[in-house]
C-alpha cells in the first residue's frame, strides 16, 4: 500500500507523476492539486495537507505575525505585511523563513543569536504560505525570504 502524498513539498509535475501511481488520471490529478492550493482541501484520502500548526499570532495594525510549531518542537515565524502597490491597490507581502535559526552570525539579528538549528524542507517553506492563505485567511500577493535563516544556504529547498 502506498503512503499518503504530502502535497505541500511537491512541485505540480512531481505531484502529477506520483498521483498516477495512485490510479488518478491526469485531469483528476490536476483538479486535486488545484483544490489543495486554491481551496486548502484534500479531495482524496491519499493526499495530505500536513503543515505545522499555528501556535501563536500577533496583530499590530494591519501586520500579522504568526508562529508555526514543527514536529520536532522548533518554531518558525512568518509575517504578513500590508502595503499599497504602485496602482494604489492593497497588497500583502509574506515574509517566510528558510531555516530555523541562522549561521550568519550578524550581531544585529536576533535569529543569528540562536545559531543554525536546521534547514527547512520545501514542504515547511510552502506551509508558511499555506498557513497564511488558509489558516490566517490572508492570501499573499508577494513572497520574500526575509524571515529566519539565509535562503542562499538552503537553495535545494528554496528553489
Q: Each predicted region: which residue ranges?
A:
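Conserved Radical SAM active-site core
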Residues: 82-100, 104-159
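Flexible, acidic/Gly-rich N-terminal and inter-domain linker regions that tether
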Residues: 1-92
Amino acid at each position: 500500500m502506498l503512503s499518503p502524498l504530502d502535497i505541500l513539498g511537491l512541485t505540480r509535475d512531481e505531484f502529477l507523476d506520483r498521483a498516477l501511481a495512485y490510479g488518478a488520471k491526469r485531469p483528476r490529478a490536476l483538479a486535486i492539486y488545484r483544490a489543495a492550493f486554491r481551496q486548502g482541501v484534500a479531495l482524496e484520502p491519499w493526499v495530505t495537507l500536513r503543515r505545522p500548526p499555528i501556535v501563536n499570532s500577533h496583530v499590530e495594525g494591519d501586520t500579522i505575525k504568526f508562529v508555526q510549531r514543527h514536529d520536532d518542537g522548533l518554531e518558525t515565524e512568518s509575517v504578513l505585511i500590508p502595503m499599497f502597490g504602485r496602482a494604489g491597490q492593497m497588497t500583502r507581502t509574506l515574509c517566510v523563513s528558510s531555516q530555523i535559526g541562522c549561521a550568519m552570525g550578524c550581531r544585529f539579528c536576533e535569529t543569528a543569536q540562536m545559531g543554525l538549528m536546521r534547514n527547512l524542507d520545501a514542504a515547511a517553506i510552502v506551509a508558511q504560505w499555506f498557513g497564511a492563505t488558509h489558516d490566517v485567511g490572508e492570501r499573499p500577493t508577494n513572497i520574500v525570504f526575509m524571515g529566519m535563516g539565509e535562503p542562499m544556504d538552503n537553495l535545494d529547498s528554496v528553489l
